[in-house]
Structures are given as structure tokens and as C-alpha cells.
């Protein structure tokens, strides 16, 4: 993910800073304890697509709908 873009992105809920988790390919808001996925290099900043960081990444991974 482009570092210049990371400087501009904020949590869509609290407008707080996000941390890039390279291991899980997510942007993490520590204040809201949510992780937003990065898919094909694009951050999905929708609350409905975020997972609680209390929940393991594998549990909340959405099914691959591209067939």
C-alpha cells in the first residue's frame, strides 16, 4: 500500500489513525479495535467488511465470491 495514501487514510468511524498490518493485509484502528481488509491493493473502508481485532483473521475472512 502506498505510504502517501496511508498518511491520508483515517478510520471511517472515529477518524483516528490507522496502522498497516503487513502480516494480515489489513488497516487497523486501535481505538475502535477494528481491522479493515486490503484486497488487491485497495483498502475496503466499510464497517460491514471490518473485523473485530479480538476475532482471529481466519474466522472473519469473507468467502471468495469470484468464480
UniProtKB/Swiss-Prot annotation:
GO terms for cellular component: cytosol. InterPro entries: Trm112-like. Pfam families: Trm112p. Gene3D superfamilies: 2.20.25.10. It comes from the Bacteria. Belongs to the UPF0434 family. This is UPF0434 protein Lcho_2556. It comes from Leptothrix cholodnii (strain ATCC 51168 / LMG 8142 / SP-6).
Amino acid at each position: 500500500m502506498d505510504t502517501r495514501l496511508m498518511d491520508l487514510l483515517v478510520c471511517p468511524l472515529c477518524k483516528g489513525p490507522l496502522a498497516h498490518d503487513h502480516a494480515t493485509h489489513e488497516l487497523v484502528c486501535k481505538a475502535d479495535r477494528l481491522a479493515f481488509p486490503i484486497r488487491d491493493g485497495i483498502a475496503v473502508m466499510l464497517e460491514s467488511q471490518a473485523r473485530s481485532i479480538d476475532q482471529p483473521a481466519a474466522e472473519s475472512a469473507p468467502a471468495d465470491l469470484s468464480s
